[in-house]
């Protein structure tokens, strides 16, 4: 079975919205370097691809056991990152957001857990390994592109003085709300 390019695009955009929101929030942080933005785009795209690919192989077997848990875990992680952004905003010398190498991995996985669910439920019907690889790579590329767009938008938003002054607070609150939405929806 195959998935139409239109359906795959809609799935890819829907999966990328978590990463888009997180990228937008992180992008509001003061003096975030281009290197950090690029690494987040790559991380989010890679984990969307990888978890969708792995999820398709695990398929129906784990679907009934893991369906609800990943959103809760991902939501908690994103909520905690929001709290950390608020904490960073309260520091007096807030010139740089503290980016740790672990953040690329942790956030990459937390925004991509839903890709594993899509793999379990939708992509596991694709029988060709090559087509499955192409489909999941497409999902990863769409995610990376949307994250890049989110970082570009956040760059324009930071130019507004009020947003720039309270960027960590705004980003932190957005992440916390987004995390709560993932947990309870």
Curated annotation (Swiss-Prot):
Its main location: membrane. Keywords: Cell membrane, Ion transport, Manganese, Membrane, Transmembrane, Transmembrane helix, Transport. The keyword Oxidoreductase does not apply. Pfam families: Mntp. GO terms for molecular function: manganese ion transmembrane transporter activity. It is a multi-pass membrane protein. It comes from the Bacteria. The chain crosses the membrane at residues 8-28, 42-62, 66-86, 103-123, 137-157, 165-185. One of its GO terms (cellular component) is plasma membrane. It is found in: Cell membrane. InterPro entries: Mntp/YtaF, Put_MntP. Probably functions as a manganese efflux pump. Belongs to the MntP (TC 9.B.29) family. This is Putative manganese efflux pump MntP.
